[in-house]
Regions:
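Oxidoreductase cofactor-interface core, primarily capturing Rossmann-like NAD(P)-dependent enzymes
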Residues: 1-3, 8, 15, 68-197, ...
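NAD(P)H-binding glycine-rich loop region in Rossmannoid oxidoreductase-like domains
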Residues: 9-58, 70
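Short, amphipathic alpha-helical "lid/cap" segments that border enzyme active or binding sites
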Residues: 19, 152-160, 262-270
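Short beta-strand elements of ligand-binding domains
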Residues: 59-65
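Terminal hydrophobic/aromatic helix or amphipathic segment near a protein terminus
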Residues: 185-244
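Amphipathic terminal alpha-helices
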Residues: 248-273
Length: 273
């Protein structure tokens, strides 16, 4: 394995400076963990890709995808991911895309430590409630979120393991848990010994903006941010109800590396007992 780094305090607007950092550190593989949630962060990753292509020592690149299987058609609200893939396809860099489904942290926090800002979405174990997009019967994949440098969470562990694969395929999956939302609620009720208050949202309701937040999310966010969060969750919920978060027929790193023991949904609910 060559030298691997995750870029930290650098100027992502300066491609030349980024290239210099990669070359001075002799970085073979770049793992981008930038939070791609707006045009600025999307451009930062594009600049990092350009710098990696210009670097004389950088050969491989993992873009900050780590979610569902993003495609241009179902996810017009996430154009930055498509732009990164388009940019990588024009380079000589070897690259791969890693799909993990949803971050399990959004159910686990704060009972299981996380380095991302997480409040309970969809299922709220703190308040024994759930706001489920669709009928809750579409399989959804969950995985624990990455913590860069410490490798203390599942996605980080599997990503590091991926670096030992000499020739990457275009896409890999990390499927640590695969179940429907109804199955997840049923398991939570079984483990906690309480009945959850479950609200279902149809696709029509979500398209009209008639979405709702879990009690924990309402408490975590200022009231002026509720509307924006509802809109964002409605968009993702529509895709989820259609099965966009289900991951199948992709090389699964969980199968390739059975020595890694991931956090399960049951582990999360046990933490809330």
């Amino acid at each position: 394995m060559g030298k691997v780094a995750v870029a930290g305090a650098v100027d992502y607007s300066d491609v030349s400076a980024l290239t210099s950092v990669l070359e001075s550190e002799q970085v073979d593989t770049v793992i981008s963990m930038l939070p791609i949630d707006n045009d600025e962060s999307g451009q930062a990753q594009l600049n990092l890709i350009e710098a990696a292509e210009k670097s004389t020592c950088t050969k491989r690149f993992l873009p900050s995808e780590f979610g569902m299987v993003y495609t241009k058609d179902p996810c017009p609200f996430l154009p930055m991911e498509a732009q990164a893939v388009d940019a990588l396809e024009k380079t000589n860099l070897e690259f791969s895309l890693v799909s993990i489904g949803l971050f399990l942290d959004y159910w686990a926090a704060p009972r299981i430590p996380t380095h991302i800002r997480a409040a309970n979405i969809i299922i709220d174990p703190e308040n024994n409630a759930a706001v489920i997009p669709g009928d809750g019967n579409t399989p959804v994949v969950f995985t624990h979120s990455p913590v860069v440098f410490t490798h203390s969470t599942d996605t980080a562990k599997y990503t590091v393991a991926l670096l030992d694969i000499p020739n990457w395929k275009r896409r890999y999956a990390i499927v640590t848990n695969r179940m429907t939302l109804n199955e997840a609620v049923k398991l939570a009720e079984e483990v906690k010994g309480v009945k959850f208050d479950v609200k279902y949202l149809s696709v029509e309701q979500m398209r009209k903006g008639e979405n709702d937040l879990t009690p924990s999310m309402k408490k975590a966010l200022p009231e002026e941010m509720h509307s924006g969060m509802k809109s964002m969750l409605a968009l993702s919920g529509i895709g989820m109800a259609a099965g966009s978060n289900d991951i199948r027929e992709i090389d699964d790193l969980v199968v390739k590396f059975p020595n890694i023991k991931p956090v399960t949904v049951r582990d999360v609910w046990e933490a809330w007992k």
